[in-house]
Swiss-Prot record:
The active site is at D52 (nucleophile). Homodimer. SUPFAM superfamilies: Pseudouridine synthase. Its EC number is 5.4.99.12. This is tRNA pseudouridine synthase A. It holds the Pfam family PseudoU_synth_1. Formation of pseudouridine at positions 38, 39 and 40 in the anticodon stem and loop of transfer RNAs. Belongs to the tRNA pseudouridine synthase TruA family. GO terms for biological process: tRNA pseudouridine synthesis. PANTHER family: PSEUDOURIDYLATE SYNTHASE (PTHR11142), TRNA PSEUDOURIDINE SYNTHASE-LIKE 1 (PTHR11142:SF0). Disulfide bonds: none annotated.
Length: 258
């Protein structure tokens, strides 16, 4: 039995998220269906981070076990031929049998993309959140300082979150402006359900001048979801990287745009 790692890219618009669901089409279902056909046996996969409905990935990491002998090219080109255009395998490699894409991960990186322009873009409309008002990046980054370290993020978790603990460790949270794009990059050991989109929604209020940077600290300490802003839309969020003890994978979405 061999353990294989896949690096996956997908556009999440047409899916209910990563995780297999009985009522809707998921990325996991499409990938397992294609892998199972190539392997001629049932294949189940594990992913580094389960993305929600409409969320994308440039570097999702998946692993699966199979005793079917196939060259690595078959696991990539053969499976890609069976996958829809909005899901593709970028790379494949054999890994140690102890490797688990979810539980071996040290941290995960997400990008949230904002298109900050007076006029919306027909090309990027489904890839970014459009904000026509000017955003104060400096104040947003000041607010990000309050997010760093291990903290209780109850104020930024959804009511449907099933995690046993609201504590998460954020190593990086930063906004970077590149032309008309503003990229929020956040790195953490793990994230709560809707956590990043809830953070973005609140940080936008700071950037628009409705709240001060210190307001984020007040919201955090409240441990109350109703004190934070509304959830930012899903289509601006991308899973872009994972770090493991032996290696890391990262493909920043803005580098694909520019």
């Amino acid at each position: 039995m061999k353990n294989y790692l896949l690096q996956i890219e997908y556009f999440g618009k047409n899916y209910c998220g990563w995780q297999r669901q009985s009522h809707s089409l998921s990325v996991q279902e499409e990938l397992e269906k294609a892998l199972s056909k190539i392997a001629n046996q049932n294949i189940e996969v594990t992913c580094a981070g389960r993305t929600d409905t409409g969320v994308h990935a440039t570097s999702q990491i998946v692993n699966f076990y199979s005793n079917a002998y196939r060259p690595l090219s078959a696991w990539q080109r053969g499976v890609n031929a069976l996958l829809p255009q909005d899901i593709k395998i970028l790379a494949v490699q054999q890994v140690n049998n102890n490797f688990n894409s979810r539980f071996t991960a040290i941290n995960r990186t997400y990008n949230y993309i904002i298109y900050n322009s007076a006029t919306s873009s027909p090309i990027f409309a489904e890839h970014c959140l459009w904000e026509n008002r000017e955003l104060d990046i400096d104040k947003m980054n000041q607010a990000c300082e309050y997010l760093l370290g291990e903290q209780d993020f109850s104020s930024f978790r959804s009511s449907q979150c099933q995690s046993n603990t609201p504590f998460r460790n954020i190593q990086k949270a930063e906004f970077i402006k590149q032309g008309s794009f503003i990229v929020f990059e956040v790195v953490g050991n793990a994230f709560l359900h809707h956590m990043i989109r809830n953070l973005v929604g609140s940080l936008l209020k700071v950037g628009l001048g409705f709240e001060s940077p210190e307001w984020i600290k007040v919201v955090l300490e409240a441990k109350d979801r109703t004190q934070a802003a509304e959830t930012a839309k899903a289509h601006g969020l991308y899973f872009v990287g994972v770090e493991y003890p032996e290696f890391s994978f990262k493909r920043q979405i803005i580098k694909l745009f520019c």
